[in-house]
């Protein structure tokens, strides 16, 4: 998810006009309340985009967290200007002394997850000068990217705007995940949520090239019943994955992952036995197993959040790409290599291993927030989420079947087109999916990687109560 999406690019004159307006309004407030302290609050963002629908929502969340602080200072007046193209501005007039309010604002800035994205300007009528952070005993503001002095980095131009936007998006994603609470659930509740992910995915229709109740897609060796049999056969494995995480002691999480991997090897045999040798859920055995184990580990002592679960996943799978796909660890015989290994050699695409190392960011940062925002019935919400995922990943299953990594760009185009015509909410969008399904069947294409990511998304959505 890009939090700057939908924002208007400003020119220099618009920025300067807003700065002049703010200074003038601050002076008016100081003249009206000569003994009070004036604090202006706005987003502190680099570049020409200062607001967007998503940034507006984030700003309001921060203000909700900041409001109790100002209430403790006794609010005399509050003025909000939230719909400006230069970004929302809020002014608080409070009692108290300038030094104290400034210290409180800096403390909030440094303690809040998004405090660094705020511009908190504190002043009063009788102050001789603005108080600096250093005069109040605080270190200079640090750069978001490298941790060095922020003023130095700005002056020297040490970082690109793209790097700045990327870091801010990362901060906002982490903040959203910290707010998504996963309660402590029973083993059966977590396992049932995982099974729901697999069963909802195969029940969803129409899905380009994938198996659903009315079509085998591009898979001649499987039906919806094959997937149901496979899902049920994996239930004991999901229970074992939960027990591994729930009972594991200590912080050597790669060892916990090793235990899970051994269980996964046994689970694959159970899957093949149930499907007469057909690979229905090999990807889910890997990724869903990791997620179930991580949830069980993170909730051993009580509730947790998605940010913590993502950290557990990354710690479990640290150096996985290097360990599995490094030059000295790859199988030399091409016949013995997996599709993922061959694609890493040919295209340098790390696939699901790379996603796991990063804590499944496509699911955590894109798919789950997107699903939570969707309206309509369950089928519509999940179809839209599937196509959102498909347009934002390098689907190794799709690449394998296409024989060329350029298929990813085609998939991006198809995803954009789908949403431009209204997505699953419109007859045109559904017709587009059906036509795409027929084209995929004809070309023997299937987006199995997107399907696996949807399973994970459904699983987490059930846990956080969004589905």
From Swiss-Prot:
What InterPro entries does UniProt report for this protein, alphabetically?
A: CitG, CitX, TriPribosyl-deP-CoA_syn_CitG
Any idea which GO molecular function terms this record carries?
ATP binding; holo-citrate lyase synthase activity; triphosphoribosyl-dephospho-CoA synthase activity
Ranges where the record places region 2-(5''-triphosphoribosyl)-3'-dephosphocoenzyme-A synthase: 179-467
Question: Looking at the record's lineage, which domain of life comes first?
Answer: Bacteria
Record keywords: S-adenosyl-L-methionine included?
no
In its keyword annotation, does this UniProt entry include Signal? no
The record's Pfam families line, in alphabetical order, gives: CitG (PF01874), CitX (PF03802)
**Catalytic activity field:** apo-[citrate lyase ACP] + 2'-(5''-triphospho-alpha-D-ribosyl)-3'-dephospho-CoA = holo-[citrate lyase ACP] + diphosphate; 3'-dephospho-CoA + ATP = 2'-(5''-triphospho-alpha-D-ribosyl)-3'-dephospho-CoA + adenine
Homology family: In the N-terminal section; belongs to the CitX family. In the C-terminal section; belongs to the CitG/MdcB family.
Function per UniProt: Bifunctional enzyme that catalyzes formation of 2-(5''-triphosphoribosyl)-3'-dephosphocoenzyme-A, and then the transfer of this prosthetic group precursor to the apo-acyl carrier protein (gamma chain) of the citrate lyase to yield the holo-acyl carrier protein.
How is this protein named in the record?
Answer: Protein CitXG
Q: Which gene encodes it?
A: citXG
């Amino acid at each position: 998810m890009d939090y700057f999406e939908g924002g208007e690019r400003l020119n220099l004159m618009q920025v300067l006009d807003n700065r002049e307006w703010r200074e003038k309004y601050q002076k008016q407030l100081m003249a009206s309340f000569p003994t009070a302290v004036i604090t202006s609050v706005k987003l502190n963002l680099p570049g020409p985009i200062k607001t967007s629908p998503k940034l507006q929502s984030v700003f309001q969340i921060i203000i909700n967290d900041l409001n109790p602080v100002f209430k403790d200072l006794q609010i005399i007046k509050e003025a909000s200007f939230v719909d400006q193209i230069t970004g929302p501005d809020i002014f608080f007039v409070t009692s108290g002394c300038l030094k104290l309010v400034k210290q409180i604002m800096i403390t909030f800035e440094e303690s809040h997850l998004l405090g660094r994205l705020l511009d908190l300007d504190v002043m009063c009528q009788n102050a001789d000068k603005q108080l600096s952070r250093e005069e109040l005993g605080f270190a200079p503001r640090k750069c978001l990217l490298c941790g060095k002095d922020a003023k130095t980095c700005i002056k020297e131009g040490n970082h690109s705007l793209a790097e700045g936007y990327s870091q801010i998006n990362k901060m906002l994603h982490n903040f959203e995940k910290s707010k998504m609470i996963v309660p402590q659930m029973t083993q059966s509740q977590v396992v049932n949520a995982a099974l729901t992910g697999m069963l909802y995915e195969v029940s969803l229709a129409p899905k380009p090239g994938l198996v659903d109740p009315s079509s085998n897609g591009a898979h001649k060796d499987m039906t919806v019943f094959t997937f149901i049999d496979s899902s049920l056969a994996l239930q004991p494995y999901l229970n074992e994955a939960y027990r591994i995480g729930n009972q594991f002691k200590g912080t050597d999480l790669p060892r916990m992952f090793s235990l899970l991997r051994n269980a996964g090897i046994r689970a694959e045999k159970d899957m093949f036995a149930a499907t007469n040798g057909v690979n229905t859920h090999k990807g889910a055995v890997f990724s869903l197993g990791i997620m179930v184990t991580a949830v069980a580990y993170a909730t051993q002592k009580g509730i947790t959040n998605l940010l913590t679960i993502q950290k557990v996943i990354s710690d479990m799978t640290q150096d996985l790409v290097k360990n599995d796909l490094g030059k000295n660890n790859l199988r030399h015989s091409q016949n013995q290599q997996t599709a993922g290994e061959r694609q890493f050699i040919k295209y340098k695409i790390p696939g699901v291993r790379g996603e796991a190392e990063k804590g499944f960011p496509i699911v955590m940062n894109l798919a789950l927030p997107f699903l939570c925002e969707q309206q309509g019935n369950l089928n519509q919400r999940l179809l839209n989420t599937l196509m959102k995922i498909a347009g934002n990943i390098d689907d190794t299953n799709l690449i394998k079947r296409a024989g060329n990594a350029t298929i990813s760009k085609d998939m991006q185009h198809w995803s954009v087109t789908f949403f431009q015509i209204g997505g699953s909410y419109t007859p045109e969008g559904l017709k587009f999916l059906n036509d795409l399904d027929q084209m995929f069947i004809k070309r023997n294409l299937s987006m199995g990687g997107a399907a696996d990511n949807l399973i994970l998304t459904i699983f987490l959505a059930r846990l956080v109560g969004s589905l």
